[in-house]
Design a protein with these regions (language model features):
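CheY-like receiver
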Residues: 125-145
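Acidic catalytic/metal-coordinating carboxylates
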Residues: 32-36, 60-65
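Charged docking surfaces used in two-component/phosphorelay signaling
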Residues: 15-23
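C-terminal output helix
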Residues: 106-123
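Receiver (REC) domain active-site loop signature in two-component systems and cognate sites
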Residues: 57
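Short amphipathic alpha-helix used as the core "switch/output" element in two-component signaling
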Residues: 39-42, 63-76, 91-96
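Active-site residues of response regulator receiver
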Residues: 54, 82
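Acidic, metal-coordinating helix/loop segments flanking the phosphotransfer/catalytic sites
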Residues: 30-50
Length: 145
């Protein structure tokens, strides 16, 4: 059984996602912000196959959360959710680090069918740490002047 960590600062979204994913046969862990998600991931000793996270959240946004979590758990795949119709620099102005082209995103609101289809699609992709085309993001201190 695959484990999915669902993170959204809206409890109703977490509950909806949890109910849909449990019904589809997944094990679900829930957090209402990025910091709580990192604590849950640290305490969870088994693999977390997918991080399903909102993009715009207080304190630690979804992109920053994904970066921290995948550094600790490189085989964890990431699916973003967002109710905002903005990407790239516009999103960065709202919430910190921005999505990159090709990052999988599920628009909110979503249906149970759309959620389970997108989760299945992302889980079927090769693990980021095993892909020869892994998009490791350099830290700012590693950038060339």
């Amino acid at each position: 059984m695959e484990t999915i960590l669902v993170v959204d600062d809206e409890p109703d979204i977490c509950e909806l996602a949890r109910d849909c994913l449990v019904a589809a046969g997944y094990r679900v862990l829930e957090a209402t912000d990025g910091e709580e998600a990192l604590r849950i991931a640290e305490a969870h000793t088994e693999p977390i196959h997918l991080l399903l996270t909102d993009v715009v959240m207080p304190r630690l946004n979804g992109v920053a959360l994904a970066g921290q979590l995948t550094r600790r758990r490189p085989d964890t795949k990431v699916l973003y959710m967002s109710g905002f119709a903005v990407v790239g620099a516009q999103l960065e102005q709202l919430s910190g680090p921005a999505l990159e082209p090709g990052d999988p995103i599920l628009p909110k609101p979503f249906t149970a069918e759309a959620l389970t289809r997108k989760v299945h699609e992302v889980l079927a992709r090769p693990s980021p740490s095993r892909s020869p085309f892994s998009r490791a993001r350099p830290r700012p201190d590693q950038w060339m002047p």
